[in-house]
Protein backbone atom coordinates (compact mmCIF):
# COMPACT_ATOMS: atom_id res chain seq x y z
CA UNK A 1 0.00 0.00 0.00
CA UNK A 2 2.77 2.46 0.93
CA UNK A 3 4.69 1.76 -2.27
CA UNK A 4 1.66 2.69 -4.38
CA UNK A 5 1.83 6.23 -3.01
CA UNK A 6 5.23 6.81 -4.59
CA UNK A 7 5.22 4.72 -7.79
CA UNK A 8 2.72 3.71 -10.45
CA UNK A 9 1.56 0.09 -10.68
CA UNK A 10 0.51 -1.98 -13.65
CA UNK A 11 -3.21 -1.70 -12.93
CA UNK A 12 -3.03 2.08 -13.21
CA UNK A 13 -1.42 1.83 -16.65
CA UNK A 14 -4.13 -0.55 -17.89
CA UNK A 15 -6.99 1.47 -16.45
CA UNK A 16 -5.69 4.90 -17.46
CA UNK A 17 -8.19 7.05 -19.35
CA UNK A 18 -6.89 8.26 -22.72
CA UNK A 19 -7.97 11.58 -24.15
CA UNK A 20 -9.39 10.54 -27.52
CA UNK A 21 -10.93 13.87 -28.41
CA UNK A 22 -8.56 14.26 -31.37
CA UNK A 23 -6.96 10.83 -31.56
CA UNK A 24 -7.90 8.09 -34.01
CA UNK A 25 -7.39 4.82 -32.13
CA UNK A 26 -8.61 2.50 -34.87
CA UNK A 27 -6.13 -0.08 -36.09
CA UNK A 28 -4.50 0.84 -39.41
CA UNK A 29 -5.29 -1.35 -42.45
CA UNK A 30 -2.50 -3.67 -43.60
CA UNK A 31 -2.05 -1.76 -46.86
CA UNK A 32 -1.47 1.53 -44.97
CA UNK A 33 0.69 0.04 -42.24
CA UNK A 34 3.96 0.29 -44.14
CA UNK A 35 3.42 3.93 -45.09
CA UNK A 36 2.03 5.15 -41.77
CA UNK A 37 4.76 3.51 -39.68
CA UNK A 38 7.52 3.95 -42.28
CA UNK A 39 8.49 0.27 -42.23
CA UNK A 40 11.14 0.59 -44.97
CA UNK A 41 12.87 3.48 -43.22
CA UNK A 42 12.86 1.57 -39.92
CA UNK A 43 14.26 -1.59 -41.54
CA UNK A 44 17.10 0.44 -43.03
CA UNK A 45 17.81 2.01 -39.62
CA UNK A 46 17.96 -1.41 -37.91
CA UNK A 47 20.21 -2.91 -40.58
CA UNK A 48 22.50 0.12 -40.62
CA UNK A 49 23.15 -0.29 -36.89
CA UNK A 50 23.39 -4.11 -37.13
CA UNK A 51 20.93 -4.35 -34.25
CA UNK A 52 19.95 -7.74 -32.84
CA UNK A 53 17.54 -6.41 -30.21
CA UNK A 54 15.18 -3.56 -31.07
CA UNK A 55 12.97 -1.68 -28.60
CA UNK A 56 9.72 -0.35 -30.08
CA UNK A 57 8.19 2.40 -27.94
CA UNK A 58 4.48 2.99 -28.63
CA UNK A 59 2.12 5.53 -27.04
CA UNK A 60 -1.22 4.32 -25.75
CA UNK A 61 -3.18 5.37 -28.84
CA UNK A 62 -0.94 3.36 -31.21
CA UNK A 63 -0.61 0.14 -29.21
CA UNK A 64 -3.28 -1.54 -31.35
CA UNK A 65 -0.82 -1.73 -34.24
CA UNK A 66 2.26 -2.60 -32.18
CA UNK A 67 2.15 -6.38 -32.75
CA UNK A 68 1.65 -6.02 -36.51
CA UNK A 69 4.56 -3.58 -36.78
CA UNK A 70 6.82 -5.78 -34.65
CA UNK A 71 6.11 -8.85 -36.79
CA UNK A 72 6.85 -7.00 -40.03
CA UNK A 73 10.15 -5.69 -38.66
CA UNK A 74 11.20 -9.13 -37.39
CA UNK A 75 10.40 -10.72 -40.75
CA UNK A 76 12.38 -8.07 -42.64
CA UNK A 77 15.44 -7.87 -40.37
CA UNK A 78 15.60 -11.06 -38.29
CA UNK A 79 16.10 -8.94 -35.18
CA UNK A 80 14.26 -9.55 -31.92
CA UNK A 81 11.77 -6.78 -31.10
CA UNK A 82 10.48 -5.69 -27.69
CA UNK A 83 7.35 -3.55 -27.38
CA UNK A 84 7.55 -0.81 -24.75
CA UNK A 85 4.09 0.38 -23.74
CA UNK A 86 3.65 2.38 -20.55
CA UNK A 87 6.57 4.79 -20.15
CA UNK A 88 8.20 5.87 -16.91
CA UNK A 89 7.39 9.53 -17.57
CA UNK A 90 5.85 11.21 -20.65
CA UNK A 91 5.22 9.18 -23.80
CA UNK A 92 6.86 11.95 -25.84
CA UNK A 93 10.25 11.14 -24.26
CA UNK A 94 12.49 8.31 -25.38
CA UNK A 95 12.41 5.68 -22.61
CA UNK A 96 16.06 4.66 -22.71
CA UNK A 97 15.85 3.11 -19.25
CA UNK A 98 13.19 0.59 -20.33
CA UNK A 99 15.20 -0.15 -23.49
CA UNK A 100 18.27 -0.90 -21.40
CA UNK A 101 16.26 -3.36 -19.31
CA UNK A 102 15.87 -5.56 -22.39
CA UNK A 103 19.45 -4.77 -23.51
CA UNK A 104 18.25 -3.27 -26.79
CA UNK A 105 20.82 -2.08 -29.34
CA UNK A 106 18.53 0.57 -30.86
CA UNK A 107 15.17 2.16 -30.09
CA UNK A 108 12.35 3.19 -32.42
CA UNK A 109 10.00 5.83 -30.98
CA UNK A 110 6.47 6.02 -32.41
CA UNK A 111 3.98 8.88 -32.18
CA UNK A 112 4.42 12.41 -30.89
CA UNK A 113 7.89 13.22 -29.60
CA UNK A 114 9.53 16.13 -27.80
CA UNK A 115 12.73 15.54 -29.83
CA UNK A 116 14.91 16.05 -26.77
CA UNK A 117 18.51 14.94 -27.36
CA UNK A 118 19.41 11.45 -26.13
CA UNK A 119 22.82 10.05 -25.32
CA UNK A 120 22.61 6.30 -24.63
CA UNK A 121 21.12 4.57 -27.70
CA UNK A 122 20.67 5.23 -31.42
CA UNK A 123 17.08 6.44 -31.80
CA UNK A 124 14.80 6.61 -34.84
CA UNK A 125 11.56 8.60 -34.75
CA UNK A 126 8.42 7.48 -36.55
CA UNK A 127 5.80 10.13 -35.93
CA UNK A 128 2.98 8.59 -37.95
CA UNK A 129 1.85 10.34 -41.09
CA UNK A 130 -1.47 11.80 -39.95
CA UNK A 131 -3.70 12.97 -42.81
CA UNK A 132 -3.98 16.68 -43.67
CA UNK A 133 -6.50 18.23 -46.07
CA UNK A 134 -4.04 20.40 -47.99
CA UNK A 135 -6.78 22.37 -49.75
CA UNK A 136 -8.27 23.51 -46.44
CA UNK A 137 -4.82 24.13 -44.94
CA UNK A 138 -3.67 26.32 -47.83
CA UNK A 139 -7.00 28.14 -47.85
CA UNK A 140 -6.68 28.91 -44.13
CA UNK A 141 -3.19 30.33 -44.68
CA UNK A 142 -4.22 32.49 -47.65
CA UNK A 143 -7.33 33.84 -45.93
CA UNK A 144 -5.43 34.89 -42.81
CA UNK A 145 -2.24 36.28 -44.39
CA UNK A 146 -3.66 38.45 -47.17
CA UNK A 147 -0.49 40.55 -47.38
CA UNK A 148 1.93 38.56 -49.54
CA UNK A 149 4.86 40.40 -47.94
CA UNK A 150 4.02 39.05 -44.48
CA UNK A 151 6.88 37.51 -42.50
CA UNK A 152 5.63 34.10 -41.38
CA UNK A 153 7.25 31.02 -39.84
CA UNK A 154 5.37 27.77 -40.50
CA UNK A 155 5.60 25.23 -37.66
CA UNK A 156 3.72 22.00 -37.10
CA UNK A 157 3.07 19.14 -34.75
CA UNK A 158 5.53 16.39 -35.60
CA UNK A 159 2.76 14.08 -36.84
CA UNK A 160 1.95 16.61 -39.58
CA UNK A 161 5.52 17.51 -40.51
CA UNK A 162 5.29 15.40 -43.68
CA UNK A 163 2.66 17.83 -45.06
CA UNK A 164 4.78 20.99 -44.86
CA UNK A 165 6.53 20.18 -48.14
CA UNK A 166 3.24 20.14 -50.04
CA UNK A 167 2.12 23.34 -48.32
CA UNK A 168 5.38 25.03 -49.33
CA UNK A 169 4.79 24.16 -52.99
CA UNK A 170 1.38 25.85 -52.89
CA UNK A 171 2.26 29.15 -51.21
CA UNK A 172 6.01 29.78 -51.40
CA UNK A 173 5.93 31.40 -54.85
CA UNK A 174 3.41 34.03 -53.71
CA UNK A 175 4.90 34.57 -50.23
CA UNK A 176 8.66 35.21 -50.47
CA UNK A 177 9.05 35.89 -46.73
CA UNK A 178 7.52 32.62 -45.50
CA UNK A 179 9.93 30.27 -43.70
CA UNK A 180 9.23 26.56 -43.19
CA UNK A 181 10.80 24.93 -40.14
CA UNK A 182 12.70 21.65 -40.29
CA UNK A 183 13.06 18.97 -37.65
CA UNK A 184 16.50 18.61 -36.12
CA UNK A 185 18.40 15.42 -35.46
CA UNK A 186 20.99 14.59 -32.81
CA UNK A 187 24.46 15.81 -33.65
CA UNK A 188 23.40 18.69 -35.90
CA UNK A 189 25.02 22.03 -35.15
CA UNK A 190 23.08 25.25 -35.59
CA UNK A 191 24.43 28.15 -37.62
CA UNK A 192 24.60 31.61 -35.97
CA UNK A 193 21.52 32.89 -37.83
CA UNK A 194 19.38 29.84 -36.97
CA UNK A 195 16.88 29.48 -34.16
CA UNK A 196 16.62 25.97 -32.72
CA UNK A 197 13.74 25.28 -30.32
CA UNK A 198 11.74 22.16 -29.45
CA UNK A 199 13.54 20.07 -32.07
CA UNK A 200 12.74 22.54 -34.85
CA UNK A 201 15.08 24.90 -36.69
CA UNK A 202 14.47 27.91 -38.93
CA UNK A 203 16.34 31.04 -40.03
CA UNK A 204 14.28 34.25 -39.69
CA UNK A 205 15.50 37.79 -40.26
CA UNK A 206 16.97 38.45 -36.81
CA UNK A 207 16.45 42.19 -37.27
CA UNK A 208 12.69 41.63 -37.37
CA UNK A 209 12.38 38.58 -35.11
CA UNK A 210 10.16 38.06 -33.18
CA UNK A 211 7.96 41.19 -33.11
CA UNK A 212 7.37 41.41 -36.87
CA UNK A 213 6.77 37.70 -37.44
CA UNK A 214 3.62 35.64 -37.40
CA UNK A 215 3.58 31.91 -36.76
CA UNK A 216 1.31 29.56 -38.71
CA UNK A 217 0.96 26.30 -36.78
CA UNK A 218 -0.37 23.07 -38.30
CA UNK A 219 -1.75 20.97 -35.47
CA UNK A 220 -4.31 20.87 -32.68
CA UNK A 221 -4.31 22.15 -29.13
CA UNK A 222 -1.71 20.66 -26.85
CA UNK A 223 1.54 21.13 -25.01
CA UNK A 224 3.51 21.79 -28.20
CA UNK A 225 1.40 24.79 -29.19
CA UNK A 226 1.31 26.10 -25.62
CA UNK A 227 5.09 25.91 -25.33
CA UNK A 228 5.57 27.76 -28.61
CA UNK A 229 3.18 30.53 -27.59
CA UNK A 230 4.73 31.00 -24.14
CA UNK A 231 8.24 30.96 -25.61
CA UNK A 232 7.44 33.61 -28.24
CA UNK A 233 4.54 35.61 -26.74
CA UNK A 234 5.36 38.62 -28.94
CA UNK A 235 4.58 36.65 -32.12
CA UNK A 236 1.05 36.48 -33.49
CA UNK A 237 -0.16 32.87 -33.77
CA UNK A 238 -2.64 31.32 -36.18
CA UNK A 239 -3.31 27.58 -36.09
CA UNK A 240 -4.90 25.12 -38.50
CA UNK A 241 -6.31 21.98 -36.90
CA UNK A 242 -6.23 19.09 -39.43
CA UNK A 243 -8.62 17.07 -37.26
CA UNK A 244 -11.41 19.66 -37.53
CA UNK A 245 -10.26 21.32 -40.75
CA UNK A 246 -10.61 24.77 -39.18
CA UNK A 247 -8.20 27.62 -38.53
CA UNK A 248 -8.26 30.17 -35.74
CA UNK A 249 -6.27 33.02 -34.22
CA UNK A 250 -4.48 32.04 -31.02
CA UNK A 251 -3.13 34.09 -28.16
CA UNK A 252 -6.10 35.25 -26.10
CA UNK A 253 -4.99 33.17 -23.11
CA UNK A 254 -1.24 33.78 -23.38
CA UNK A 255 -1.21 36.82 -21.11
CA UNK A 256 -3.17 34.96 -18.45
CA UNK A 257 -0.79 32.00 -18.69
CA UNK A 258 2.21 34.31 -18.27
CA UNK A 259 0.55 35.92 -15.24
CA UNK A 260 0.16 32.46 -13.70
CA UNK A 261 3.84 31.71 -14.32
CA UNK A 262 4.83 35.03 -12.70
CA UNK A 263 2.65 34.17 -9.70
CA UNK A 264 4.49 30.84 -9.38
CA UNK A 265 7.81 32.71 -9.41
CA UNK A 266 6.63 34.77 -6.44
CA UNK A 267 5.60 31.59 -4.64
CA UNK A 268 9.09 30.26 -5.27
CA UNK A 269 10.60 33.45 -3.82
CA UNK A 270 8.60 32.87 -0.62
CA UNK A 271 9.69 29.22 -0.40
CA UNK A 272 12.32 27.95 2.03
CA UNK A 273 12.31 24.25 1.11
CA UNK A 274 12.38 23.07 -2.51
CA UNK A 275 11.63 19.60 -3.80
CA UNK A 276 13.47 18.75 -7.03
CA UNK A 277 11.37 16.32 -9.08
CA UNK A 278 13.18 14.03 -11.51
CA UNK A 279 10.83 14.04 -14.50
CA UNK A 280 13.13 12.40 -17.04
CA UNK A 281 15.92 9.84 -17.15
CA UNK A 282 16.51 10.02 -20.87
CA UNK A 283 17.06 13.67 -21.81
CA UNK A 284 20.72 14.50 -22.22
CA UNK A 285 22.37 16.47 -19.36
CA UNK A 286 19.55 15.86 -16.87
CA UNK A 287 22.10 14.93 -14.18
CA UNK A 288 23.95 18.19 -14.78
CA UNK A 289 20.64 20.04 -14.44
CA UNK A 290 19.89 18.38 -11.09
CA UNK A 291 23.33 19.30 -9.78
CA UNK A 292 22.98 22.86 -11.09
CA UNK A 293 19.61 23.36 -9.38
CA UNK A 294 20.87 22.01 -6.06
CA UNK A 295 23.79 24.43 -6.22
CA UNK A 296 21.57 27.44 -7.02
CA UNK A 297 19.19 26.61 -4.17
CA UNK A 298 22.11 26.20 -1.78
CA UNK A 299 23.65 29.52 -2.83
CA UNK A 300 20.28 31.16 -2.18
CA UNK A 301 20.44 29.90 1.41
CA UNK A 302 17.55 27.48 1.00
CA UNK A 303 17.05 23.75 1.41
CA UNK A 304 16.41 21.18 -1.32
CA UNK A 305 15.40 17.54 -1.48
CA UNK A 306 15.33 15.32 -4.55
CA UNK A 307 12.44 13.01 -5.49
CA UNK A 308 11.98 10.44 -8.24
CA UNK A 309 8.37 9.26 -8.19
CA UNK A 310 7.65 8.40 -11.83
CA UNK A 311 4.51 9.93 -13.31
CA UNK A 312 3.35 12.81 -11.15
CA UNK A 313 -0.02 13.11 -9.50
CA UNK A 314 -1.33 15.16 -6.54
CA UNK A 315 -1.52 12.15 -4.21
CA UNK A 316 2.20 11.38 -4.55
CA UNK A 317 3.39 14.92 -3.89
CA UNK A 318 0.95 15.37 -1.00
CA UNK A 319 3.10 12.93 0.98
CA UNK A 320 5.72 15.66 1.39
CA UNK A 321 4.02 18.56 3.22
CA UNK A 322 7.38 19.99 4.30
CA UNK A 323 8.12 21.05 0.72
CA UNK A 324 7.08 24.62 -0.11
CA UNK A 325 7.59 24.47 -3.90
CA UNK A 326 8.49 21.64 -6.29
CA UNK A 327 10.85 22.11 -9.25
CA UNK A 328 10.21 19.76 -12.18
CA UNK A 329 13.17 18.71 -14.33
CA UNK A 330 11.56 17.29 -17.46
CA UNK A 331 11.51 17.60 -21.22
CA UNK A 332 10.14 20.86 -22.70
CA UNK A 333 6.81 19.20 -23.56
CA UNK A 334 6.15 18.24 -19.92
CA UNK A 335 7.78 21.13 -18.04
CA UNK A 336 4.80 23.52 -17.96
CA UNK A 337 2.68 21.49 -15.57
CA UNK A 338 -0.73 22.77 -14.50
CA UNK A 339 -0.20 22.72 -10.74
CA UNK A 340 -3.71 23.90 -9.83
CA UNK A 341 -4.63 20.37 -8.71
CA UNK A 342 -1.51 19.99 -6.57
CA UNK A 343 -1.25 21.02 -2.96
CA UNK A 344 2.03 22.84 -3.57
CA UNK A 345 3.14 24.76 -6.69
CA UNK A 346 5.23 23.02 -9.36
CA UNK A 347 7.61 25.37 -11.22
CA UNK A 348 10.16 25.03 -14.01
CA UNK A 349 13.94 25.27 -13.46
CA UNK A 350 13.88 28.69 -15.15
CA UNK A 351 11.23 29.99 -12.74
CA UNK A 352 13.16 28.61 -9.79
CA UNK A 353 16.31 30.39 -10.95
CA UNK A 354 14.47 33.69 -11.35
CA UNK A 355 13.32 33.33 -7.75
CA UNK A 356 16.72 32.34 -6.32
CA UNK A 357 19.37 33.92 -8.56
CA UNK A 358 19.64 37.71 -7.99
CA UNK A 359 21.32 38.13 -11.39
CA UNK A 360 18.44 36.54 -13.34
CA UNK A 361 15.36 38.64 -14.03
CA UNK A 362 11.90 37.89 -15.38
CA UNK A 363 12.20 38.19 -19.16
CA UNK A 364 8.53 38.03 -20.10
CA UNK A 365 8.61 34.57 -21.69
CA UNK A 366 9.13 30.97 -20.63
CA UNK A 367 12.25 28.84 -21.00
CA UNK A 368 11.20 25.20 -20.81
CA UNK A 369 14.43 23.58 -22.00
CA UNK A 370 16.59 23.19 -18.89
CA UNK A 371 19.71 22.62 -21.03
CA UNK A 372 19.65 26.32 -21.95
CA UNK A 373 20.17 27.21 -18.26
CA UNK A 374 23.34 25.16 -17.83
CA UNK A 375 26.85 26.61 -18.20
CA UNK A 376 27.45 27.11 -21.90
CA UNK A 377 23.71 27.35 -22.63
CA UNK A 378 22.10 30.29 -24.40
CA UNK A 379 20.27 31.44 -21.23
CA UNK A 380 22.94 30.68 -18.62
CA UNK A 381 23.36 33.36 -15.93
CA UNK A 382 26.10 32.92 -13.35
CA UNK A 383 25.17 33.28 -9.70
CA UNK A 384 26.84 36.48 -8.47
CA UNK A 385 29.40 36.43 -5.70
CA UNK A 386 27.84 37.44 -2.41
CA UNK A 387 29.44 40.09 -0.26
CA UNK A 388 29.23 39.16 3.45
CA UNK A 389 27.64 42.53 4.22
CA UNK A 390 24.87 41.88 1.68
CA UNK A 391 24.25 38.22 2.54
CA UNK A 392 21.13 39.10 4.56
CA UNK A 393 18.54 41.44 3.12
CA UNK A 394 14.77 41.72 3.19
CA UNK A 395 12.06 42.54 0.71
CA UNK A 396 8.28 42.36 0.60
CA UNK A 397 6.35 39.36 -0.68
CA UNK A 398 3.89 40.30 -3.42
CA UNK A 399 1.60 37.46 -2.32
CA UNK A 400 1.44 37.72 1.48
CA UNK A 401 2.55 41.34 1.89
CA UNK A 402 4.93 40.26 4.64
CA UNK A 403 8.64 40.90 4.91
CA UNK A 404 10.81 38.00 3.81
CA UNK A 405 14.49 37.52 4.52
CA UNK A 406 17.08 36.29 2.07
CA UNK A 407 20.09 34.43 3.41
CA UNK A 408 22.50 34.14 0.51
CA UNK A 409 25.37 31.74 1.06
CA UNK A 410 28.76 33.44 1.05
CA UNK A 411 31.19 31.69 -1.30
CA UNK A 412 33.66 30.89 1.47
CA UNK A 413 31.11 28.82 3.37
CA UNK A 414 30.88 26.33 0.51
CA UNK A 415 34.26 24.90 1.56
CA UNK A 416 33.36 22.54 4.38
CA UNK A 417 35.50 19.97 6.11
CA UNK A 418 34.90 17.40 8.78
CA UNK A 419 35.81 19.83 11.56
CA UNK A 420 33.07 22.31 10.67
CA UNK A 421 30.34 19.92 9.60
CA UNK A 422 28.78 19.85 13.09
CA UNK A 423 27.63 22.66 15.38
CA UNK A 424 28.01 22.14 19.12
CA UNK A 425 24.89 23.03 21.02
CA UNK A 426 24.79 24.38 24.55
CA UNK A 427 22.81 23.07 27.45
CA UNK A 428 19.97 25.49 26.76
CA UNK A 429 19.61 24.13 23.19
CA UNK A 430 19.90 27.67 21.89
CA UNK A 431 19.40 28.20 18.18
CA UNK A 432 22.81 28.07 16.51
CA UNK A 433 21.72 28.40 12.89
CA UNK A 434 18.49 29.19 11.05
CA UNK A 435 16.94 26.07 9.52
CA UNK A 436 13.82 26.05 7.35
CA UNK A 437 13.19 22.40 8.23
CA UNK A 438 13.42 23.18 11.95
CA UNK A 439 11.05 26.14 11.63
CA UNK A 440 8.51 23.94 9.85
CA UNK A 441 8.82 21.29 12.57
CA UNK A 442 8.26 23.91 15.26
CA UNK A 443 5.06 25.06 13.53
CA UNK A 444 3.50 21.58 13.49
CA UNK A 445 0.88 20.72 16.09
CA UNK A 446 2.37 17.23 16.55
CA UNK A 447 6.16 16.89 16.44
CA UNK A 448 6.57 13.20 17.16
CA UNK A 449 7.03 11.16 20.33
CA UNK A 450 9.08 12.77 23.09
CA UNK A 451 11.52 10.31 24.65
CA UNK A 452 11.69 12.35 27.89
CA UNK A 453 15.04 10.78 28.79
CA UNK A 454 15.69 10.74 32.53
CA UNK A 455 12.23 12.03 33.37
CA UNK A 456 10.35 8.74 33.60
CA UNK A 457 11.14 5.68 35.74
CA UNK A 458 12.51 2.53 34.12
CA UNK A 459 10.02 -0.37 34.28
CA UNK A 460 10.17 -3.99 33.23
CA UNK A 461 8.31 -5.22 30.20
CA UNK A 462 4.73 -6.20 30.96
CA UNK A 463 2.29 -8.37 29.07
CA UNK A 464 0.19 -6.39 26.64
CA UNK A 465 -3.34 -6.77 25.35
CA UNK A 466 -4.38 -9.80 23.31
CA UNK A 467 -6.87 -10.23 20.53
CA UNK A 468 -7.92 -8.07 17.62
CA UNK A 469 -8.84 -4.41 17.57
CA UNK A 470 -12.56 -5.09 17.35
CA UNK A 471 -12.55 -7.21 20.52
CA UNK A 472 -9.57 -7.60 22.86
CA UNK A 473 -9.66 -10.42 25.44
CA UNK A 474 -9.95 -8.03 28.37
CA UNK A 475 -12.94 -6.23 26.85
CA UNK A 476 -16.50 -7.24 27.63
CA UNK A 477 -18.37 -8.05 24.44
CA UNK A 478 -22.11 -7.51 24.45
Curated annotation (Swiss-Prot):
One GO molecular-function entry: 2-(3-amino-3-carboxypropyl)histidine synthase activity
Swiss-Prot/TrEMBL cofactor(s): [4Fe-4S] cluster
UniProt keyword list: Iron, Iron-sulfur, Metal-binding
Disulphide bridges, residue numbers: none
GO-annotated cellular components: 2-(3-amino-3-carboxypropyl)histidine synthase complex
Family: Belongs to the DPH1/DPH2 family. DPH2 subfamily.
Subunit structure: Component of the 2-(3-amino-3-carboxypropyl)histidine synthase complex composed of dph1, dph2, dph3 and a NADH-dependent reductase.
NCBIfam families xrefs: diphth2_R, DPH2
Name of this chain's protein: 2-(3-amino-3-carboxypropyl)histidine synthase subunit 2
This protein's encoding gene: dph2
